[in-house]
Amino acid sequence: MRGAIRIVESGCLARPARAALGVGKFQLRHVIDSAVSAVFDVDLRDLRAPTRGSTRAAFARQVAMYLAHVVCGLSLTEVGALFARDRTTAAHACRLIEDRRDDPELDGRLEHLERAVACLFDALIARRG
């Protein structure tokens, strides 16, 4: 978690349509899952499970879908495919997370995650270039 905090404090800003910049879907999913897993203390296996799993794992997965859509600029269809879910499931996840941003604690976590995922992608893109 300390590493994620340092990344967040570096001040990287999210840019839309990161997926179009040549970062592979596997890398995209790995970066998002790793960040969400660390912040919400959910095992990666639970986050990637084909079934809904625990309430905690399902919520963390919804956050991951939200980040893929908002930070990485994926369409809801692409988010659904990335997480082996339907497009409507991805849409529901994004609406749910957006509605819950009124909670200051959750909103703070989401802001940190957005910056962290953006920074990690900046690093991946720089390495590829």
Regions found by a protein language model. Give the residues of each.
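General nucleic-acid-binding
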Residues: M1-S34, R128-G129
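Intrinsically disordered, low-complexity basic tails/linkers immediately adjacent to helix-turn-helix/homeobox/MYB/SANT
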Residues: R6, A14-R18, R100-G129
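Helix-turn-helix DNA-binding elements, focusing on the entry/boundary residues of the two helices
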Residues: D33, S75-L76
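Short, Lys/Arg-enriched anionic-surface-contact patches
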Residues: A38-R61
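DNA major-groove recognition helix of helix-turn-helix
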Residues: H69, A93-C94, E98-R101
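Short alpha-helical "recognition helix" segments of helix-turn-helix
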Residues: T77-F83
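Helix-turn-helix DNA-binding helix
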Residues: T89-A91
